[in-house]
Amino acid sequence: MDATRELATRRRGRRLKPMDPAAFRTSLDTAKPPKVSAPLRALWHAAKGDWNRAHEIVQDEDGPEAAWVHAYLHRVEGDLSNAGYWYRRAAKPVAKGELQEEWAAIVETLLVD
């Protein structure tokens, strides 16, 4: 695991447990998000319908993973020009497909990489 990923998977000085995409989806049935990186927590809140909380979590985060989630959130909001800015920051192409498909692709990438 590279240093950037290592930092992204730490919380309060403890290494986070790995989680697979299916377990992440199952966690949506719980009241609190799992102990995952900030970008993944933002996606968790977004899936639960709390766009504002998701945006609060990711807006002050650095790095391409956070930028990708930030782009997705602005796409959900319908602010495509702002989303485009964040896709560029993430070095990702602007998504054109269904929002649910993009959410799943981001989750898969962030949990597997």
Name these PLM-found stretches.
Residues D62, G78-G97:
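TPR/TPR-like (Sel1-like) alpha-helical repeat modules
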Residues S27-K32, H55-P64, A91-A95:
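Solenoid-like repeat scaffolds
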